[in-house]
Amino acid sequence: MNSKKHLGHTARKRFGQNFLHDTSVIQGIVAAIYPQPNQFLVEIGPGLGALTEPVGELVDHLTVVELDRDLAERLRHHPFLHQKLTVIETDAMQFDFDELYTTENLAEKGQKLRVFGNLPYNISTPLMFHLFKYHDVIQDMHFMLQKEVVKRLCAGPNSKAYGRLTIMAQYFCQVMPVLEVPPSAFKPAPKVDSAVVRLIPHKELPHPVKDLYWLNRVCSQAFNQRRKTLRNALSTLFSPENLTALGIDLNARAENLAIADYARLANWLADNPPADVNNDEILDSEE
């Protein structure tokens, strides 16, 4: 028996497909999302419809973004949901959520996007960074992720899980763990534990920065050298005198600073950029 086959579809490794089938877990996720009939919901990676079906039954319309051509075609011909579904066959990493918000006239309706999904673990972090760019048009997000990633999203200072992903996620959103999910809830079963997280974009950013590039840059540089003191890790960006003037302990390490501290550092860099920095540099590294 092919353990990677579920409901007639073979999971594709390149898409990071693991299909959710545990009824109690599905019910728990749908309850957490709490979809209402007139809301505009968007599912990323609907797969074989484990969440699509129970959510679709509760709403008037559901938009799904699916990269797998075969799965997208199945959803277009879904036996009882096809009239409710708008299937967008594309890579969510390339999708413009602002355009969807505008096209659907959600501002006039006083609504924002509600986004959810069982995200492929191999792209979950860059996909969330992509979604953070659209925080102004998103009401909330509910995602199934690798448990380790959820711990990092929800972490606080002075912990091993605290890192660049924590800072960037909590800069844009209030982050809350929802439930933990064992590998047995999926087919094929992943080799890691999973968890569901809720992210609610802040209505007003609590620690706004002048240029997001610098927040990204200072976090990347600090956490990529997290065993070093900040005096050494950030030596190409700040002099010891600058750090001290900004209220930073020279002997502190990356995990010791709060988001407000990183925002303060980023705003100083926006006003005092180092001469040799390339602002087009792409910072996608994990900390």
UniProtKB/Swiss-Prot annotation:
List of residues binding S-adenosyl-L-methionine: N18, L20, G45, E66, D91, N118
Claim: Heme is one of the keywords in the record: no
Source species: Haemophilus influenzae (strain 86-028NP)
Family recorded in the similarity comment: Belongs to the class I-like SAM-binding methyltransferase superfamily. rRNA adenine N(6)-methyltransferase family. RsmA subfamily.
One GO CC annotation: cytosol
EC id: 2.1.1.182
Signal peptide, first to last residue: none
InterPro entries: KsgA/Erm, rRNA_Ade_diMease-like_C, rRNA_Ade_Mease_Trfase_CS, rRNA_Ade_methylase_Trfase_N, rRNA_adenine_dimethylase, SAM-dependent_MTases_sf
UniProt keyword annotations, A-Z: Cytoplasm, Methyltransferase, RNA-binding, rRNA processing, S-adenosyl-L-methionine, Transferase
Protein name, as recorded: Ribosomal RNA small subunit methyltransferase A
Functional note: Specifically dimethylates two adjacent adenosines (A1518 and A1519) in the loop of a conserved hairpin near the 3'-end of 16S rRNA in the 30S particle. May play a critical role in biogenesis of 30S subunits.
Protein's cellular compartments: Cytoplasm
